[in-house]
Structures are given as structure tokens and as C-alpha cells.
Design a protein with these regions (language model features):
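Nucleotide-sugar-dependent
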Residues: 260-272, 286-287, 291-293
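Acidic donor-binding loop of glycosyltransferase active sites
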Residues: 251-267, 280
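A charged, aromatic-enriched C-terminal amphipathic alpha-helix characteristic of glycosyltransferases
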Residues: 315-350
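N-terminal pre-catalytic "stem/leader" segment of glycosyltransferase-like enzymes
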Residues: 1-80, 300
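Conserved catalytic-core segment of nucleotide-activated headgroup transferases in glycan assembly
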Residues: 23-31, 154-156, 161-244
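Membrane-proximal helix-turn-helix segments that form the acceptor-binding/catalytic region
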Residues: 105-125
Length: 352
């Protein structure tokens, strides 16, 4: 590690919010430490021993700032101006990066106008997905852009379990169409029954409901009701309908042979990142992490039939399973580890 990498500290700032400040003096730390897990946008802070702050009036010690741009872009613009006035070197990144989320933001023209002003003011931009890099350049063709998905503490954490059984469904949002959650359950259940493997699914809260159903959902949980009724037709299915702490969630995932999903949201790919930490394959999905860590298993450019065939092989071929896991760790250490990300971030900020 170079001296510049070792001294580089990044403050990740999100406008609004009430979480205050979380510092990462020990990097990833240990699973179960207080605060948010060092993944997603918190990972950029953790991999540089920096901090994550929320609130428009956050006081920063660090001179290098990654500013998260949410749906209220004029608020982010105001904070960006204040940070620059304070002498900070500010790089921006969109917080909600699914294509349908970005498209929803820009249905409001004022947001697009504010985004263009933000891209004109920022020192640079961080693209967390393949699809966001050209978006920044569309707003400002001269803006320096670094492509760097959220890293994972793959070198620091190994959450593997000696006992593995069944298939873990990676998605949980039934009513977010791009997740293809119901389709994943419908298609994997016959394979699981054929191979005598249990299926675990988390019934997430119902989101993206029509207005009337959103009100009624306070009385009837539509997501849980759907999963309950589906499980009645699939005896091998286990439905978890409660909120799980992050540590318990990862331990639960690690007890399975693989993660299965049909997500087409084009997100950074936390599902694949979680599977990586658990040392199990992630099959399907077109997120950035899925495509980088599990290139031979991801859903990008593959049919559902091909994806199910990969599941079948992983469940029945132990040597193939072990090779896939070994290769995923190797790729992650090279391209999505904390050490690799820290070096890329340091070099990018120095270049601005």
C-alpha cells in the first residue's frame, strides 16, 4: 500500500436523514459491530477508514467527499455548493441506481435541470453501475467519471457455513416489477422439488403499490398473503415474514447452497455481494456485482432456461460448485475488494 492510499480518508455524505455520523476507523470491522454494515455506499467510507454522514448541516473533517444524489436534487445541489465553498473536493454519485428509479427521478424536469447543474459543479462523478457512467457524461461531457461498484470486504470476511442446504431467493420485493420476484419463485420451485432441495424466501414489505392498495396494505399485508398462498402449493418452501437483523440475514443466506434471482433492475448488486461474503454462488440477476463476480452465472444475456440449468449443475456437481466459489473470490479480490477500491479512489481524487 502506498503512503497516499494509507492516508486517504473519504467522507460519504447523504443530504437529509437522521443517522448522524458513522466512522470506520477499523475498516470493515467485524460482523455484528454497531451501526450499518460496511456495504453499499457505506463501503466507500469503510474501505478508506473514513466516515458516513447524513444531514444537510454535517460537519466534515475529511477534505475528500463523496456526495450521494437522491430524489431531492435541489437539496443535493445546495449541499454541493456549501461543500465546495468550504474547500472540499467533491465527487457525486446517484444513490438510487436502478434504471426504473433513475427514470422516475427524471420524470420531474426540475430534477434533470438540477442534475445537470450538479454535474457542472462537481469535481468528478462515481459510476456504481454500467448504466450510470454514460448518464453523467450526458449531463456534462467533460466531467471526470470513475467506474467503481461498491466494494466488499472479501479479504476481511468469510461468512461461509460448513452445513449448506437448499436455495435462497435473492429478491424480496414482490411488487417491484423489475425484480421478477414472483417469476423467480414460480420457475425455481419445480427444480427444487425435483432435486429435493428446500427454498427460503423473505417476504419483504409491499412497496410500489397503487394508492388504494397502499392504504389497505396497512390492514392486509399483500406480500405476505401472496407468499403464504404460494407456499401452500410448494411444501419445500420456507417463508420468512419478519424483519431480520443484517447479521442473522447473512448467516441464514450462508446456510444455503446457492442464491437464485431473476432481477433485471441494473443495480450495483448487493445480492451477489452478500453471496460472495457467504462463499456461495449467486445465479441470475443483471446487477454490476453479478456480472463482475459471477460472470458465468449472471442473468445478463442468458435465458431463464439457461439460468435454471446452471442451478441444476451447481446443486449436483460439487467440484463445479467449489470452482465457481473459488473463482468468484479471486475476481472480487482483483476488482471489488476493499484494497482494490481504496487504491482506485485515492488515485481518482488525486487526479482531480
Amino acid at each position: 500500500m502506498s503512503d497516499s492510499d494509507a492516508s486517504f480518508r473519504l467522507a460519504v455524505v447523504t443530504p437529509g436523514g437522521k443517522d448522524g455520523r458513522q466512522s470506520f476507523p477499523n475498516g470493515a470491522g467485524r460482523l455484528g459491530d454497531p451501526g450499518h454494515l460496511p456495504v453499499n455506499f457505506h463501503a466507500y467510507a469503510a474501505c478508506t477508514w473514513g466516515s458516513y454522514l447524513s444531514g444537510d448541516g454535517a460537519m466534515l473533517e475529511e477534505s475528500h467527499v463523496l456526495l450521494l444524489i437522491g430524489s431531492k436534487m435541489e437539496r443535493a445541489e445546495a449541499l454541493l455548493r456549501r461543500l465546495k465553498d468550504a474547500g472540499k473536493k467533491v465527487v457525486i454519485t446517484i444513490k438510487e441506481t436502478g434504471l426504473q428509479q433513475i427514470g422516475g427521478h427524471f420524470q420531474k424536469f426540475e430534477n434533470w435541470s438540477a442534475f445537470k447543474r450538479i454535474c457542472a459543479l462537481a469535481h468528478g462523478a462515481l459510476a456504481t453501475t454500467y448504466d450510470t457512467e454514460p448518464l453523467y457524461l450526458a449531463a456534462n461531457r467533460n466531467l471526470p467519471v470513475l467506474f467503481l461498484p461498491p466494494p466488499y470486504p472479501v479479504e476481511e470476511w468469510d461468512l461461509s457455513s460448513p452445513e449448506k442446504s437448499g436455495i435462497f431467493i435473492g429478491t424480496r420485493q414482490l411488487f417491484v416489477t423489475s425484480r421478477n420476484h414472483a417469476l423467480a419463485l414460480v420457475m425455481v420451485s419445480p427444480l427444487a422439488a425435483e432435486m429435493n432441495e428446500p427454498v427460503t424466501v423473505i417476504s419483504g414489505r409491499a412497496s410500489d403499490l397503487p394508492p388504494v392498495k397502499r392504504v389497505l396494505n396497512k390492514l392486509v399485508d399483500y406480500s405476505h398473503d401472496w407468499h403464504r398462498r404460494f407456499a401452500e402449493t410448494a411444501p419445500q418452501m420456507r417463508v420468512i415474514s419478519r424483519q431480520m437483523p443484517a447479521q442473522e440475514y447473512l448467516r441464514t443466506m450462508a446456510g444455503h447452497k446457492l442464491v437464485f434471482q431473476l432481477d433485471q433492475s441494473s443495480v450495483p448488486g448487493q445480492v451477489a455481494g452478500d453471496a460472495l461474503l457467504c462463499r456461495i454462488p449467486c445465479v441470475g440477476g443483471n446487477g454490476t456485482a453479478e456480472r463482475i463476480i459471477f460472470p458465468d452465472l449472471c442473468g445478463h444475456g442468458r435465458t431463464a432456461e439457461e439460468i435454471l440449468g446452471l442451478c441444476r449443475r451447481l446443486l449436483g456437481d460439487k467440484s463445479y460448485f467449489e470452482e465457481v466459489v473459488r473463482r468468484s473470490v479471486e475476481l472480487a479480490c482483483e476488482k471489488m475488494s476493499y484494497s482494490a477500491a481504496r487504491k482506485s479512489l485515492s488515485l481518482f481524487w488525486v487526479s482531480l
